[in-house]
């Protein structure tokens, strides 16, 4: 493939990707806020539009609420910290030989 054909192909692919991105953003635009919601059907339609718009933008936030797994991990961490503080509470854990002293 020649250099000019390669450049033309790269430009075409770039333009296609840009056009596809613009098309997706335009189709997912927020529904306009209507102050003329008079009936229950209009309000229901507006809420459905908002739900479809924000439905794909909402993210699940893991770890925000404490569950059984988080409680178990927290308890285990507390137990580990307590065991460390008991072992290092000013007592010698092992005796040093005279050869080990610098």
Curated annotation (Swiss-Prot):
Domain of life: Eukaryota
Biological processes per GO annotation: digestion; larval feeding behavior; larval foraging behavior; neuropeptide signaling pathway; regulation of response to food; social behavior
Cellular component annotations (GO), alphabetically ordered: extracellular region
Location in or out of the cell: Secreted
Modified residues (Phenylalanine amide): 62
Disulfide bonds: none
Entry similarity comment: Belongs to the NPY family.
Role noted for this protein: An integral part of the sensory system that mediates food signaling, providing the neural basis for the regulation of food response; coordinates larval foraging and social behavior changes during development. May have a hormonal role in females.
The protein's name in its UniProt record: Neuropeptide F
Native source species: Drosophila pseudoobscura pseudoobscura (Fruit fly)
Gene field: npf
